[in-house]
Amino acid sequence: MTDLIVVGAGLYGLTMAERCASQYGLKVTVLDRRSHIGGNAFSEFDPETGIEIHKYGAHIFHTSNERVWEYVNQFTQFTDYVHRVYTTHRGEVFPMPINLGTINQFFRAAMGPDAARDLGGASPSNLDEQGVSLIGRPLYDAFIRGYTAKQWQTDPKDLPASIISRLPVRFDYNNRYFNDTYEGLPKDGYTAWCENMANHPNISVQLDTDFFDVSQPLNRDSVVGSVPVVYTGPVDRFFDFEFGELGWRTLDFVRETVDTADFQGIPVMNYADESVPFTRIHEFKHFHPERTYDSGVIVREFSRFAQGGDEPYYPVGTVQDREKLLQYRQRAAAQDGVHFGGRLGTYQYLDMHMAIASALTNVPGVAEMAAR
């Protein structure tokens, strides 16, 4: 007998399951259609090289939320890794995010902060204008426009200005990618961290289990209304795409083993030029300099619109998407005994710490739902 079913073994679902099991004594069953836990944070050790690979793209944990940091440290220790990214433009490598070092290297100048700020422009109405207003046309065209066009397969003039809001621009020489108080990578890997979260006598995990497969007993049609559910899958799928499918971007990864101790000297190298088909190359060994390897693994990352069967990564959020989402949110709010959460369940981009923080906030409400 189970008190709560959690659909999705990503960080939102696992946080919800662990708290409900350990703090409220609920017996929780976690379902995931994949063959592993951890959601998109899942990592695996390459059998040929022993290098830890982030299967769904680079994941770096960072947060300034004390509550989240205290919580995650119950399940893993973190390295002192600090993320730094570089970008290649026309055969030259520049530090990212855009900072005084990037600006002065690009212009072959020695600008101070005030002079660099003066490169910007007027108030923006779309992503193209937002980028220019932040850093001026030359820098925007070099580092943002082509990269964004590859990411979204859309002219930046047709994208909302909000998409670029996550891109920091600094008028000093700080090239640390994140500014959060805490940052690092789980010492034993993301999968070990997630397994520790699920390691509780009140938690049962069932992998390779599709919540919508009526041939397995814990399917949507049989449990909704009978057992409380935390649902972290796509919200449109839960309602059988009643109002249409929501738009997502997906990623393709091409993995290659390289017979060299160091391919690019950095974990992540972006490629800003539209003439290069991929957006970046990951070299995962550099995430853990405390580990030693003789060879390497690189992964090229490509971005495109998601189609049926693809893994959804980033919500597109067009006007049509937002109209559909409003309808799905109304249906979700009226769905008794089901809590919708996480990146897919709420149709929003969430960093790892944000997903965990959201789950921690919502645990009491879910526990109350399960007690009815």
What are these regions (language model features)?
Residues 87-227:
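Active-site/ligand-binding neighborhood in enzyme catalytic cores
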Residues 15:
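Short alpha-helical segment within the catalytic ATP-binding CA
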Residues 5-7, 31, 223-236:
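Short hydrophobic core segments
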Residues 18-47:
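Glycine-rich FAD pyrophosphate-binding loop
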Residues 1-12, 29:
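Beta1/beta-strand and adjacent pyrophosphate-binding region of the FAD-binding site
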Residues 29, 204-208, 339:
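General small-molecule cofactor/ligand-binding pocket signal
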Residues 227, 236-371:
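C-terminal segments that line or cap access tunnels to active or ligand-binding sites in enzymes
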Residues 42-55, 61-113, 167-173:
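A conserved beta-strand/loop capping segment in the N-terminal third of enzymes
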